[in-house]
Amino acid sequence: GAFKSGWNLGQEFVNMYLGHGGEFFKSGTAQPNVNNEKGVAALNVIKSLTELSNPDFLTQDTNAVKEEWESGNVALMHVWNSGASSLLDDEGDQAIRADTRLAPSPSVGGGSIPATTLWWDGIAIATNTSDENAEASFRALVGAASSAELANEYADATVWLIKDYKGGNTAGPVVDAATRGASPYPSFP
């Protein structure tokens, strides 16, 4: 697994905790709520996965695991959808690419909720720009993000939330996760 200390390991906790039905905040508050039975269960799943992982799992981020996959050294991995498209591109060993299949995120603990999160891209505009430049940038970005033609040209770059988008090779697992009740990435209580 991609259990590199820091963000990657933290993200796997997020996946497993939400997959167990955990809530990050106590209801109606900003008080953390992970020191509980579901938090311990998430940690135990991660611990059990390390037994199946590369011995250097604490040094391997998603990119390192993808390199191992493309080298034929990994049989199964959990990767963000945005990173999956590079597994299906024309670079690297085409025999490995031909044998690569994307599957929906699994559930954990006997539940039905996928052990993943949905994280949608957004836009940001610098605060030190003029109002005119900010408005022009916003209009250009929103125009590009709402173009079905552009979305379908880059169907594997991301999953687009616009009318007439025809999902590419990587869209299936995201649609499945959303349909099965995956949580949005936690950002506030």
For the regions a language model picked out, list residue spans one by one:
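Alpha-to-beta junction loops
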Residues: 70-80
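Short helix-initiation/N-cap motifs at beta->coil->alpha
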Residues: 57-71
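Stable alpha-helical elements in mature extracytoplasmic
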Residues: 9-16, 39-46, 65, 83, ...
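Short helix-loop capping/hinge motifs at secondary-structure junctions, enriched
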Residues: 23-25, 51-52, 129-136
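Glycine-centered hinge/linker elements that transmit conformational signals in sensory
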Residues: 28-59, 105
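Beta->alpha turn/N-cap motifs
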Residues: 62, 79-84
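C-terminal lobe and pocket-closing loops
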Residues: 82-95, 108-189
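Extracytoplasmic/periplasmic solute-binding protein
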Residues: 1-32, 38, 74
